[in-house]
Amino acid sequence: MDLTQQAKDIQNVTVEETNKNNSESIECSKITMDLKFNNSRKYISITVPSKTQTMSPHIKSIDDIVVLGMNLSKFNKLTQFFICVAGVFVFYLIYGYLQELIFSVEGFKSYGWYLTLVQFAFYSIFGLIELQPIQDKRRRIPGKTYMIIAFLTVGTMGLSNTSLGYLNYPTQVIFKCCKLIPVMLGGVFIQGKRYNVADVSAAICMSLGLIWFTLADSTIAPNFNLTGVVLISLALCADAVIGNVQEKAMKLHNASNSEMVLYSYSIGFVYILLGLTCTSGLGPAVTFCAKNPVRTYGYAFLFSLTGYFGISFVLALIKIFGALIAVTVTTGRKAMTIVLSFIFFAKPFTFQYVWSGLLVFLGIFLNVYSKNMDKIRLPSLYDLINKSVEARKSRTLAQTV
C-alpha cells in the first residue's frame, strides 16, 4: 500500500518510535498514525508491527474452538454448553454400553490393558485425521507436558478398563461419579483453588454414598473383588489430576483438542505397548482377539470411535468452562449409564444402590449449587419456618370461617 497517496488529505501525522538501551535487545517498534479526514470527525489508529516482529499464523483463530470440524466459537456460551452436553451424553452413553458389552465376551475380562492399547491406537489415528484440515499443525504444548498427560491418561483409562474384570459395571461407574473429590484435591494442590462449605459437604456426601454403594455391591455381586476397588480408586486419582493439567496446558498454550488427543494418546500407546511387551501380556491377548475379531476388534472400533467423539466434547467443556463443570456434566452422564446398565444387562439389584446413589448425586447437586449461588437461591431455614407458620395460620383461619 502506497502510504504517500493515502496521506494526501491527512492534516497531522505523528510517528513515535521508542528504543531502549543499545545493549538490550531491540524491542518491537510501533508506528502509530492518527489520521483525521477533512469532512469527518472520525479518527483512525493504525499500528504497524516492525519487521522483527513475528506474526504467528494461528493468531487470527486464537479464540476458535473447533470440535469434530464444528466451530463452537460462532455460538454464544449457552449454546456452546448445550452442544457440548448433548455430545457428551449421546456418545458416552453408547460408549458405556459397548464397554460393558465387550467385557461380557467370555474370557475377555483379563485383557483390559490390551483393549486400552487398541483404544489408544484408534484415538491416535482419529486425532491425526482431525488435525489434517488445520493449517497450523505445530505442536504448542511442550513435549514434557504431553509425556505427563499421556502417563495420567494411561493410568486413568487402563486402570478403569482393567477394573471391570473385578467389579460390577455400576460399581465402577459410581466410583467415577465421585471423581469430584480428587478433582477438588487436585484443584487445591495444582492450581491453588479454595473451596467453600458447600463443596466440602458435597465431598462428604459423595464419600458416604460411595462407601454405602460399595458395601451393598460386596454383599450381592458375585464378581466383587477388592482389587477392582483399588484399581478404580487409582484411576480416579489419575483422572482428577489430568483434568486440571489439561485445563492449565490448553489455556496456557492455546492448544486445539485434536492436538491434545493426538499427542497424549499416541505417547500413551507407546507406554502401554512397552508395558505389555515387558510383562508378556501382548501375545495371549492378540491370540484371543484373533479368534473373535468381530466381537473384539469390531466392538473396540465402535467403542473407540464413540469414546473419541465424547472426549472431544469433554475437552471442549474443559477449555470453555473449566474442569469442574466438565466433571459435573460427565457425572450426570454416568448416572444415565448406570440406569441403562441395569436395563440392558442382567445383574443383581438392591435398593441400597438407589439410596447410596441418591446420596452421591446429592453431593453433586451441592457442588453445582456452590458454583451458582448467585443464580440458584434456595430458601433459608428461617424462611421455611415462617412459611410453615403462615400456612398453619391460614388453615386455622379457613377452618374458623
Curated annotation (Swiss-Prot):
Pfam families to which the protein is assigned, alphabetical: UAA
Keyword vocabulary terms for this entry: Antiport, Glycoprotein, Golgi apparatus, Membrane, Transmembrane, Transmembrane helix, Transport
Organism: Pongo abelii (Sumatran orangutan)
Topology relative to the membrane: Multi-pass membrane protein
Lineage summary: Eukaryota, Metazoa, Chordata, Craniata, Vertebrata
One function term, GO molecular function aspect: 3'-phosphoadenosine 5'-phosphosulfate transmembrane transporter activity
Signal peptide: none
Predominant location category: Golgi
Free-text function comment from the UniProt entry: Probably functions as a 3'-phosphoadenylyl sulfate:adenosine 3',5'-bisphosphate antiporter at the Golgi membranes. Mediates the transport from the cytosol into the lumen of the Golgi of 3'-phosphoadenylyl sulfate/adenosine 3'-phospho 5'-phosphosulfate (PAPS), a universal sulfuryl donor for sulfation events that take place in that compartment.
Protein name as annotated: Adenosine 3'-phospho 5'-phosphosulfate transporter 2
Catalytic reaction annotation: 3'-phosphoadenylyl sulfate(in) + adenosine 3',5'-bisphosphate(out) = 3'-phosphoadenylyl sulfate(out) + adenosine 3',5'-bisphosphate(in)
